[in-house]
Structures are given as C-alpha cells and as structure tokens.
C-alpha cells in the first residue's frame, strides 16, 4: 500500500486521537473535533491535554456546537507553502479547510506548472476553495 501524505504543513498537525475525536493544532490553536474514523481508545483527550482551546460536541438531533474552553481567536490565518488560508470555527465542526487535501493541491499545482500552456480549471469540490487557491498559485 502506498502512503500519500500532505507533509509540508508547518501550521497544522494532528496531535492525537481517541474515542471518535481528533486533536489538531491549527497554528497556535488546539481544536478537538469528532472524527468517525477514530475507533480506538487512547483515553480522554480533554483530560490528557489541558491546552485545548475548543471542542466540538455533536448533538443527537444533528449538528452540534463548539465550546470554547480557553480564550480563542474568532478567526486566524494558517499557511501551507506559499498559500494563506483564513480559518475559523464553522457551524458543523469544520474550520473552512481540509488540510489532508494538501496532497492533492501539490499534484494539481505540479500538473498546471508543468503543462507549459494556459490551463482552464473547474473545481467540482469547491467547499473550501483550497484547490482553487492552489491552482491559481
């Protein structure tokens, strides 16, 4: 199996995961969010990491809410290579960016830069615009 990583991040990292939750660092902000792929038990992340800024709690009626545990910026910027993204806590556990997509952004940028011609680009997964920003860079 070939492992494909978005390994050029300096402002983002997955710190830990347990019991359906993923702890991430977004620049200097630590967020704990649900992740249905996390099926293992490494203990309660809220107890193990006192520096968490905010946690997203799902509702049994759908959706959920953020609870700020520490003073948290309303919005902030993170960088990936020469790209800058505006991040904030969104209504459905998201931050406005999917950092794991950076692997695809790299491929997209390489293909466009190596094409030696003008390229028209239609982004059919434009939920955040990350791929569009990468294509333009």
Residue ranges and their predicted role:
Residues 1-6:
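N-terminal accessory targeting/assembly segments
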Residues 8-27, 31-99, 106-109:
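Non-catalytic substrate-recognition/targeting regions of SAM-dependent transferases
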Residues 101, 105, 129-132:
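Hydrophobic alpha-helical segments
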Residues 110-137:
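Conserved SAM/SAH cofactor-binding pocket of Class I
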């Amino acid at each position: 199996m070939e492992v494909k990583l978005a390994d050029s991040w300096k402002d983002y990292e997955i710190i830990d995961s347990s019991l359906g939750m993923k702890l991430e660092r977004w620049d200097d902000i630590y967020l704990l969010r649900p992740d249905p792929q996390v099926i293992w038990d490494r203990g309660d992340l809220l107890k193990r990491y006192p520096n968490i800024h905010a946690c997203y709690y799902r509702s049994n009626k759908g959706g959920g809410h953020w609870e700020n545990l520490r003073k948290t910026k309303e919005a902030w910027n993170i960088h990936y290579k020469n790209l800058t993204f505006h991040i904030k806590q969104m209504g459905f556990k998201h931050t406005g960016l999917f950092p794991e997509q950076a692997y695809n952004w790299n491929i997209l940028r390489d293909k466009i830069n190596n094409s030696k011609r003008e390229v028209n680009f239609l982004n059919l997964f434009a939920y955040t615009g990350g791929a569009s920003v990468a294509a333009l860079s």
